[in-house]
Amino acid sequence: LCAGQTGAGKSVFMNGLICSLLYRFTPDELRMILVDPKFIEFRSYQDIPHLLLPVVDDPNQAKVALKWAVREMERRYRILAKIGARNLASFNQKVEEMGAAVIRDILVSEDTGEEMPSSVQSAGHDWMEAFEPDEAGVPRIGKLPYIVIIIDELADLMMVAKKDVEISIARIAQKARAAGIHLVVATQRPSTDVVTGLIKANLPSRVSFQLASFVDSKTILDKSGAERLLGQGDMLFIPPGSSQPSRLHGAYVDDEEIGKITAFVKSQGKPTYRNEILLDDEADEDEFESDADPKFDEAVSLVRNAGHASASFIQRHLKVGYNRAARMIEDMESRGIVGPADGARPREVLLR
């Protein structure tokens, strides 16, 4: 959680943070979602290969992206549980060391002892489909990258969709770390209607630049001090597990340096955008009644031809939101078109 008034150095700090990540991680190791309601702060990073999405400047799209991050967090925890890993680093190490043997162990059925054929894919844009069957119905897995979500101005998001944004941020902050998903939230208006108690309680790591008043400092740090900082990168930092702030000075990164860094990174490869992240389930719900989805017949035809079924498979091919695709799968199961979920195995298609 980062706060600072205009000119205090907050934006320079965010740029320094992003550049440090670009120096340390390849796109296979780290993917980012940058939310920039002010349109100008993160423009320099457009089209770098680390991005999951083009820089998000629409608060409604940011709300949908945060909901996706919650679903991805839950999906990753299911994968970590199957493989017996406590965190993402342990998971990636197991995949690297054991390869296909890991998949074979995971896909052995406890009931029948039968093994499913498996394939291991390298890290990259296919990581979003880990444990999903490919076109041939073969489950696959690969290394999972870290995901960092950076929000430049929280106030704009809270004005548009306060409840959804607050819940998503709280859920990601309180349990996504072990799944490799991290969140940086910044604001220049640290009032209690923007930085709510729920958000603050779940973001224990705080950075405060110069603030206008004691009240603002109390909101961010739970103590005074930020109102007496000097500006231009002078900050107080409270790490997780500590109640005492440390006084630091942020690194200065100018526009020319950012331009050189991003130009080099862009020369190494193009981004693989996953625009299905922004498919809005609420918009889908406005278009149809739950018992009469106009794309249901198309989805049935798709899974019959493929011979396997999953919500992610329908989402990718029909370009619908995840929740809508999941409802179609549940409807198919209730009608006897597909079988029940069976751990890592793809659902069996009963209708031929």
Which role fits each region the language model picked out?
Residues 1-122, 129, 137-211, 215-229, ...:
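P-loop NTPase catalytic phosphate-binding loop
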Residues 136-138, 239-352:
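Conserved alpha/beta core segments of nucleic-acid transaction machinery
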